[in-house]
């Protein structure tokens, strides 16, 4: 009897579901069509509202142009340039910190290096720190005011942070491998080195200048050219099984720099599209001229560092290769 009663209840449930299913089909299909139409109308209305919102408000950096304007928040649900989201995702995927790299494993190799090799390493990394400090505090930040989209502003803040991470990473090498006296001497050398100062000031002059396109050209060339003479040394050592963990960290930095240079170059091209042929010719000539100046400075700086160890010929090839890669970021 117990089994029979349970069986009857199951049959009753199945019968009710069969009877109800046609009704469910009729009641669900029609609203789907209605909802599709409704969503389409909502999307059109939302697009119109978004355009209206943009026309009556500004992002925070634009406050300086119109203090009376309404301020709007960044909306990642409405991305006008897909490249902004693509680069943002690439940057966050690539995120790393120097504390995760086992630099202390390089200590035995460091102790076997000659005093000349260690001195060169300290100076090379201090030079890299100088340029990354320029980028983190000025180079990326100064491009925010000229951003074409609000998401571009966010990407530059992301890049600026990673530039600070890069600068921090060289200090991690110093604190792991060398003494406070050696570190202080390397920083003193960087301040007093005329070629290093000239490289930094050449781009800073345009960062603080009035031309937004020249800022982007300068930033692209710093990320794509000026740093690479410094990157050569740890890569050279790693080929000879020396400072291999430091070289792994440099490869992480190189991966970031490739994205940074590409993005600034891309935004430069987008900005150039809306200008006159005369302006495009002006910027083309400026880009080539600045690249040649920085390339010459890079060779002079590299010669001062690498000639004593007989590495300059290989470094010159490496610098020339990256100068051509920098031009590719401008489609030149």
Task: Please state what every model-predicted region is.
Residues 52, 60-65, 276-332:
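Extended, helix-rich structural scaffolds rather than catalytic motifs
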Residues 184-185, 190-192, 207-208, 265-289, ...:
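Extended amphipathic alpha-helical segments with heptad-repeat/coiled-coil character used for oligomerization
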Residues 141-208:
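Long, hydrophobic, well-ordered secondary-structure blocks that form the structural core
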Residues 1-16:
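Single conserved hydrophobic/aromatic residue that forms the stacking wall/gate
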Residues 128-136, 159-170, 174, 192-200, ...:
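Alpha-helical transition-metal enzyme core signature, strongest for iron centers
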Residues 104-127, 146-147, 186-221, 238-244:
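Acidic/His metal-coordination segments adjacent to aromatic residues that form catalytic metal sites
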Residues 39-105, 110-117, 147-154:
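Extreme N-terminal leader/anchor segments
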